[in-house]
């Protein structure tokens, strides 16, 4: 029986309302969390509804949500085991054993549910703690039960697994824990809320029905990851080497070192990324759109408006990919490098040693923090015109490659002639007023997130290449 004999502990408040808003008040406290796919109703003793086994796609969705070992290696970092320090073990398709979390289908259920949380919160007895049920029907998402990243059945796997690990609904006050703050209560922040967009109603099916068929979150989102790491610690061993994450405009898939890590049901990209360490890259070289690439913790990057999630009515997600928060200020999870495309791209660095490749277009580079931020160009010095402005920014122009704006940059390097320029020594080659281009950077680096950002005092070096 699921909860019998498995140890749970009380979850104390973190003091951060964005984390506490999804905590239920208890979580598992065993060295290994075991899960299984039940084969019959006999696994449960006395249940008051019919039973069916999961199909292969639902099993794959559960593996993606929980295990770093059961799915493709490229998917490991998106799983609970991949971003927390908690070990997870799959017991198999069985009615035996003492799994913490068991999965089955209730063909009469519309949606999904968990029988009880860790710690017997509902109070029905510990035997059903962690039992997850997929519904045999979804009146709000059609009759298809095939789960794939971004569709409703995939979302159920993430949402109900979150409950089984110790997360509550973000939109509800429950068990002494308040709901999420209004501005962070949506799918952009958590899979645990019923609010698809900020301000939507959590009490009707209407908004769910308006979400695009492939527009649900593809992974646990920022607040889910932060809350689960608060309870179970963080994993810095998954993708701890140099990892390249890439995307294309004609697919919703996320590629990890060239392999599919998120096999999307459609063209939408809607996920949060945690990385364990190494020198890591966001590669957007396939795009010709005007990219907004934000590497800050909690920040969001926009690759293509056509690939933004439709969250109901006229509301779309604020980004395609979001960065997880740092865990206790540890910089190993930061992304260090970004490669732009052929559009007019905007890059925002973090506190790591950043390297940016701009590509074509009129790009904007903001080095952020650091004492020695660099921009490197492949051409010779004489091919570029540099203007310095009263606000400290620079514009670097090339007849073919475009005009770039440099902010918080200390050195410019022209690799062909190995010329190194100190920005403090640069005088404008032509006297011009400040050139400014307003960038609408829409992401999650909002004031509401600042309380969870912890930064190191070290002064990094940011390198920008074009």
Segments from the language model and where they lie:
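RTX-like calcium-binding, glycine/aspartate-rich low-complexity repeat tracts
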Residues: 1-364, 368-466
């Amino acid at each position: 029986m699921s909860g019998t004999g498995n140890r749970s502990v009380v979850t104390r408040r973190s003091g951060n309302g964005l984390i506490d808003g999804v905590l239920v008040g208890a979580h598992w406290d065993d060295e290994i969390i075991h899960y299984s796919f039940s084969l019959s109703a006999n696994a449960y003793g006395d249940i008051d509804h019919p039973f069916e086994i999961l199909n292969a796609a639902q099993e794959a969705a559960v593996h993606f949500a929980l295990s770093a070992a059961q799915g493709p290696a490229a998917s490991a970092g998106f799983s609970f085991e991949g971003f927390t320090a908690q070990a997870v073990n799959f017991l198999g398709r069985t009615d035996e054993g003492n799994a913490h979390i068991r999965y089955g289908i209730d063909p009469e259920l519309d949606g999904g549910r968990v029988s009880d949380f860790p710690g017997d919160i509902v109070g029905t007895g510990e035997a059903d703690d962690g039992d997850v049920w997929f519904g045999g029907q979804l009146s709000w998402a059609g009759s298809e039960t095939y789960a794939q990243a971004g569709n409703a059945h995939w979302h159920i796997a993430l949402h109900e697994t979150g409950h089984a690990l110790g997360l509550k609904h973000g939109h509800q006050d429950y068990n002494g824990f308040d709901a999420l703050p209004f501005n962070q209560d949506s799918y952009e922040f958590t899979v645990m809320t019923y609010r698809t967009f900020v301000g939507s109603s959590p009490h009707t099916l209407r908004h769910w029905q308006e979400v695009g068929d492939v527009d649900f979150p593809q992974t646990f989102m920022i607040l889910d990851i932060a809350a689960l790491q608060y309870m179970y610690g963080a994993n810095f061993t998954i993708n701890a080497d140099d990892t390249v994450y890439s995307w294309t405009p004609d697919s919703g898939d996320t590629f990890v070192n060239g392999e599919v890590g998120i096999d999307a049901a459609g063209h939408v990209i809607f996920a949060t990324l945690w990385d364990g360490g190494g020198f890591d890259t966001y590669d957007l070289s396939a795009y010709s759109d005007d990219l907004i690439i934000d590497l800050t913790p909690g920040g969001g990057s926009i690759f293509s408006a056509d690939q933004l999630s439709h969250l109901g009515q006229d509301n779309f997600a604020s980004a395609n990919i979001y960065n997880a928060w740092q865990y206790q200020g540890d910089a190993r999870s930061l992304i260090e490098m970004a490669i732009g495309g052929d559009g007019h791209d905007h890059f925002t660095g973090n506190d790591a040693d950043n390297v940016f490749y701009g590509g074509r277009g009129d790009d904007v580079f903001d080095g952020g923090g650091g004492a020695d931020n660099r921009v490197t160009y492949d051409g010779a010095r004489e091919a570029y015109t540099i203007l310095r402005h009263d606000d400290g920014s620079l514009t670097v122009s090339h007849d073919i490659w475009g005009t770039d704006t440099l902010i918080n940059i200390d050195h410019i390097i022209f690799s062909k002639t190995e010329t190194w320029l100190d920005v403090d020594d640069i005088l404008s080659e032509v006297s011009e007023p400040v050139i400014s281009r307003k960038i609408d950077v829409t992401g999650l680096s909002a004031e509401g997130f600042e309380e969870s950002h912890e930064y190191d005092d070290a002064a990094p070096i940011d390198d920008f290449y074009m």
